[in-house]
């Protein structure tokens, strides 16, 4: 098990526990990454304020924000894209005639995001997904406070039909071509379990706003 991911999950769970003990009545809480590649550029408070008005808060329980380029592919799940990109190998052995690598799968995710979040023909200001973070997300406390972050893949949290679609269209293989056993507590992005559990048990609505909260910018 990847100790870095497990440590991050424990740290986020520690924040949740602090909220439970010290601020149980707050309406919202925020998770934010402060590393060099996530929340870059100046924050745009007018965007944050916009989505905290009654007009918008009625439509979401978790809200993250678009970014060009959209960097956080690992936390992203939607429709037939359920598994994290690093469930797939970075390379396959030469004798494996067909299969999907992490980079091929990332291309699939990017294309899907371009066709949904960045689709100019879609006039909606936010898009429903199964999991998304991209460095900054707001959560309704009453919906999320009793869920937890995991640093491993838990198949029981997925929508079964969507997971089956993922496995059929994009079957994960080991480098030697053998199937990946997704029941084996594989390392996974900690946000996915948090979001999927909230969707499954609390009917959470996970949304991505098309507006950029940081920037805007085209390159990073």
Where are these regions (language model features)?
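Active-site-proximal specificity loops/subdomain of glycosyltransferases
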Residues: 1-27, 31-32
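Conserved glycosyltransferase catalytic-site signature
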Residues: 8, 132, 185-196
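Short, internal active-site loops enriched in acidic
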Residues: 24-41, 213-214
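A structural signal for short, well-ordered beta-strand segments and their strand-loop junctions
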Residues: 30-31, 62-65, 206-209
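Active-site donor/metal-binding and catalytic loop motifs
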Residues: 142, 147-152, 170-188, 200-220
């Amino acid at each position: 098990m990847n100790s870095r991911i497990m440590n991050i999950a424990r740290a986020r769970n520690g924040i949740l526990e602090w909220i439970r003990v010290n601020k149980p009545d707050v309406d919202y809480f925020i998770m934010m990454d402060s590393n060099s590649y996530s929340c870059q550029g100046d924050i745009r408070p007018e965007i944050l304020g916009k989505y905290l008005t009654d007009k918008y808060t009625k439509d979401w329980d978790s809200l993250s924000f678009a970014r060009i380029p959209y960097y956080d592919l690992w936390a992203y799940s939607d429709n037939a894209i359920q598994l994290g990109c690093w469930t797939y190998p970075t390379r396959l052995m030469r004798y494996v005639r067909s299969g999907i690598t992490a980079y091929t799968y990332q291309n699939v995710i990017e294309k899907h995001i371009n066709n949904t979040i960045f689709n100019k023909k879609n006039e909606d200001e936010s898009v429903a997904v199964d999991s998304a973070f991209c460095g900054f997300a707001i959560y309704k406390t009453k919906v999320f406070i009793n869920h937890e972050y995991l640093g491993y893949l838990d198949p029981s949290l997925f929508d079964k039909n969507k997971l089956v679609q993922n496995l059929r269209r994009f079957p994960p293989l080991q480098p030697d071509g053998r199937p990946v056993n997704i029941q084996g507590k594989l390392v996974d992005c900690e946000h996915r379990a948090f979001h999927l559990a909230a969707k499954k048990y609390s009917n959470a609505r996970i949304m991505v706003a098309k507006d950029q909260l940081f920037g805007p910018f085209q390159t990073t």
